[in-house]
UniProtKB/Swiss-Prot annotation:
It is found in: Cell projection, Axon; Cytoplasm, Cytoskeleton. It comes from Sus scrofa (Pig). Residues 471-534 have a biased composition (Acidic residues). This is Neurofilament light polypeptide. Residues 281-396 are annotated as: Coil 2B.
Length: 549
């Protein structure tokens, strides 16, 4: 996926101010360290890339050859459906483009905010401001990043809702497709039944035709038999006439009987002919009616078959249209899913990048806070030494003010010798011993409170970082090791401090033995300072134990 940014979005003034920021080197002002620490440089300009969103729609040209056979009403309905679907797709694309533009604007805003925060961080590093400002600044940045993450989560949920809606539409189309498949199977079943009926009607017609042929043969046979019978009867009648004529002379009384017999046979022949004609006519009528009925049934079956074929063709075209629509929607859904996944991955990369930057910034802040604490300790030690020197000078001045004018030179020489010895011994001791020996208790407690506040700030920053990113097993082990090492270092420092304190006490006792006479007030002051030192040490140890607990 292409990046969200392009070069035309940035003007020359913006590049000059934020993108092309020169590298700033910050040297630590900590005494005793000569190495310089270089501050981090601003982030490079975002990689330019062009953004292109291309959408492809499935054309309806493949449906035109099949739509020519449909009615005008069906064509109008299908065109209306296609228009409504196209308008819906255009609306969805417009909505997605608007959201994409809002995402781009949000990314630019976050980048600008990041640049502003980087500039503020550089200014704060240069000024060495208080750690509390850093904390408030980064807490605000963390809140902004969390709000941005929540917005991205909400957008993701909205896109998931749209995806669920598209899936519901797809399920509806699949259900409709299944219904159309069932209706097609029903139509095919009815078509098979109609075909079976047509086949049965054709078989019945063939049987009836065969029966008609057999009946016609039977009629012809009966006609032939009837004609033969008539011929036989006529032959018998002629033979009877001949015999009657031959016997007229001998038997004149048989003519009436022959006439009666002839009349009877003629009546019987006429009756047989009439019965045969009536039976033939009735049989022919029945066969004609049955043939007409079968013809109507065959015609109805043919009409039903043609209607079923037309319906099957229409349903097939509709199924193909639904299938094409389904494929187009599936393709669109796949494209939307790919785009959403790409957007989500890009947003996740941005969030991870911001989290990494925040983590590095927090680590740098912790490092700078530690350096600040070290500098504060050095400053505190220097202030303690200055206060000790000031107190020694004030003690000398007060002591000299009460001496006589005659012993001014002697007292001044003794005090200068004592001051030289004490100053030389104080310079030999460490700054930490000087601070615990002769600095006022309220100032020491104030410095300790500042140290505790700085340490609490560092621990709070580490705790927030740990909350924002849950540590893995390896990180947890490393943190445990670091804690153990820190505890071991703290214990070693405490032991070294105790050893130094013991050595300082020994040196002080030796110096106290050497400094005899004229230093009673200084001895009392050193005793008071030692008592205050012990009290401060007890209070510091109590605070350290409470902090460890």
């Amino acid at each position: 996926m292409s990046s969200f940014y392009s070069e035309p979005y940035y003007s020359t003034s913006y590049k000059r101010r934020y993108v092309e920021t020169p590298r700033v080197h910050i040297s630590s002002v900590r005494s005793g360290y000569s190495t310089a620490r270089s501050a981090y440089s601003s982030y490079s300009a975002p990689v330019s890339s062009s953004l292109s969103v291309r959408r492809s729609y499935s054309s309806s040209s493949g449906l035109m050859p099949s739509l020519e056979n449909l009615d005008l009403s069906q064509v109008a309905a299908i065109s209306n459906d296609l228009k409504s679907i196209r308008t819906q797709e255009k609306a969805q694309l417009q909505d997605l483009n608007d959201r994409f533009a809002s995402f781009i604007e949000r990314v630019h805003e976050l980048e600008q905010q990041n640049k502003v925060l980087e500039a503020q961080l550089l200014v704060l590093r240069q000024k060495h401001s208080e750690p509390s400002r850093f904390r408030a600044l980064y807490e605000q940045e963390i809140r902004d990043l969390r709000l941005a993450a929540e917005d991205a989560t909400n957008e993701k949920q909205a896109l998931q809702g749209e995806r669920e809606g598209l899936e519901e539409t797809l399920r509806n189309l699949q259900a409709r497709y299944e219904e159309e498949v069932l209706s097609r199977e029903d139509a095919e079943g009815r078509l098979m039944e109609a075909r079976k009926g047509a086949d049965e009607a054709a078989l019945a017609r063939a049987e009836l035709e065969k029966r008609i042929d057999s009946l016609m043969d039977e009629i012809a046979f009966l006609k032939k038999v009837h004609e033969e019978e008539i011929a036989e009867l006529q032959a018998q009648i002629q033979y009877a006439q001949i015999s009657v004529e031959m016997d007229v002379s001998s038997k004149p009384d048989l003519s009436a009987a022959l006439k009666d017999i002839r009349a009877q046979y003629e009546k019987l022949a006429a009756k047989n002919m009439q019965n045969a004609e009536e039976w033939f006519k009735s049989r022919f009528t029945v066969l004609t009616e049955s043939a007409a009925k079968n013809t109507d049934a065959v015609r109805a079956a043919k009409d039903e078959v043609s209607e079923s074929r037309r319906l099957l063709k229409a349903k097939t075209l509709e199924i193909e249209a639904c299938r094409g629509m389904n494929e187009a929607l599936e393709k669109q859904l796949q494209e939307l899913e790919d785009k959403q996944n790409a957007d989500i991955s890009a947003m996740q990369d941005t969030i991870n990048k911001l989290e990494n930057e925040l983590r590095t910034t927090k680590s740098e802040m912790a490092r700078y806070l530690k350096e600040y604490q070290d500098l504060l300790n050095v400053k505190m030690a220097l202030d303690i030494e200055i206060a000790a020197y000031r107190k020694l000078l004030e003690g000398e001045e007060t002591r000299l003010s009460f001496t006589s004018v005659g012993s001014l030179t002697t007292g001044y020489s003794q005090s200068s010798q004592v001051f030289g010895r004490s100053a030389y011994g104080g310079l030999q001791t460490s700054s930490y011993l000087m601070s615990t020996r002769s600095f006022p208790s309220y100032y020491t407690s104030h410095v300790q409170e500042e140290q505790i506040e700085v340490e609490e700030t560092i621990e709070a920053a580490k705790a927030e970082e740990a909350k924002d990113e849950p540590p893995s097993e390896g990180e947890a082990e490393e943190e445990g090791k670091e804690k153990e090492e820190a505890e071991a270092e703290a214990e070693a420092e405490e032991e070294g401090a105790q050893e130094e304190e013991e050595a300082a006490e020994k040196e002080e006792s030796e110096e106290a033995k050497e400094e005899e006479g004229g230093e009673g007030e200084q001895g009392e002051e050193t005793k008071e300072a030692e008592e205050e030192e012990k009290k401060d040490e007890g209070a510091g140890e109590e605070q350290a134990t409470k902090k460890k607990d």
